[in-house]
Amino acid sequence: MNLLDQQTLINLLHQEADVAIGCTEPVMVALAAAKTRDMLGTLPRLVDISVSSAVWKNARRVGLPGTGEKGLAMAAAMGLLAPVEAGQRLLAALTPVQVEQAKILVREGVVKVGVVAAKEGLYARAVARSNQHEAIVELNGSHKNFSALWLDGRMAGGAGENLNLKLEALLAQDYQSLLKQVLSLSPEELYFLYQGAEDILTFAREIHQGGRNPLSAMASFFRRTESGGESLEVLIRNLTGIAVAERMAGATYPVLTCAGSGNQGILAAVSLLLAGQELRAGPESVTRALAIAHFTNMYLKAYTGKLSPLCGAVTGGAGVAAAICWLLEGSCQQIINAMQIVLGNLCCVICDGAKESCALKISTAAVEAVRAGYMACQGINLEAGTGIVGKKLEDTMELVRKVYQGGLGEIDYYLGKVDYLLSTN
């Protein structure tokens, strides 16, 4: 068993827990477009964007920060006008005038978008042409690291794919070994998780308490629902629902991602800060719980892929369940049992793309994760052979991987054609 050293674990955590504004798939496309303009040194006359079915599915109906707009063409057009050095915050770096310029670029047909059916998971490619030059940018396996750059047919850099630490490296050890390593990490190096979580919760509370008007009707619903004297579960449901609905509607607030996902970052942050308050856990304990949730999610995604037909609320929820159980002083086996309960409960929830109704899935997963943590600490577990649940956590995840990569391997393609399928009925 080859254990990763502590510094590699910290590097992996920082890679996957990064601040983003807006859904990370449109951000990925915007970064590709921004990099092409940076390479050309001028605004291109034409940009061709190609993405995997999974990226298309996730990016086609989600709100773009501060614009009221949706779609990959608009995301790419915004990227052409945004500073690439802003990283995953670039969509919020545009002025209102630049947003209007981006709309003009879309109307004039400067940006073309297509799907590469042969590509899976996280993949985006931008080909931009000026009057004199052509720039090509690829991102593969990462929302933010450029895997290849070409200028006028010559390699101009990249190799970000090689620099990108792979989640699969976590599978060199079993989950129990990973958990021990995570708990041995210095809380000082993990504290950024706590700070990021506090920022998310502060934003959600502002809307919940009426200090900020929501963009999303769904967020308004969560604000109105049982707005006084909520139980822990109801409060977690409402605040996760508010934060996700607002983010998907295009709110310009920064979110610390979890395994590259902002919504899963919200799931971990809100659930564990509120549970920590309920249990009177100190900042260090909550920080460690957040680290457990993040690394657990990464471990499970090493089986399924970061962007797959499996809804991220499932693995993210399992991570929260593990962390809740740890806060309740559960044993390692009980922590695994909590994860198995979530997987047995939610494993058939599919990802049908990023949109405001993700708030329903995330808020449901948050409540079920908290329940699973408490259930496991009370001695409840799912027996092996109960549905998809295996004897060991790793057995369960191998079966989940087979179901989603084999049996449901083409589902992203069909879900990406939802508009077409609806129009033919």
From Swiss-Prot:
Identify one Pfam family in the record. SDH_alpha
* One MF annotation (Gene Ontology) recorded for this entry: L-cysteine desulfhydrase activity
Q: What GO biological process terms does the UniProt entry carry, in alphabetical order?
A: L-cysteine catabolic process to pyruvate
Classify the source by domain of life.
Bacteria
Q: Which InterPro entries match?
A: Ser_deHydtase-like_asu (IPR005130), UPF0597 (IPR021144)
The family line of this record is: Belongs to the UPF0597 family.
Name of the protein in question: UPF0597 protein Moth_1414
Q: Can you name the source organism?
A: Moorella thermoacetica (strain ATCC 39073 / JCM 9320)
**Which lineage?**
Bacteria, Bacillati, Bacillota, Clostridia, Moorellales
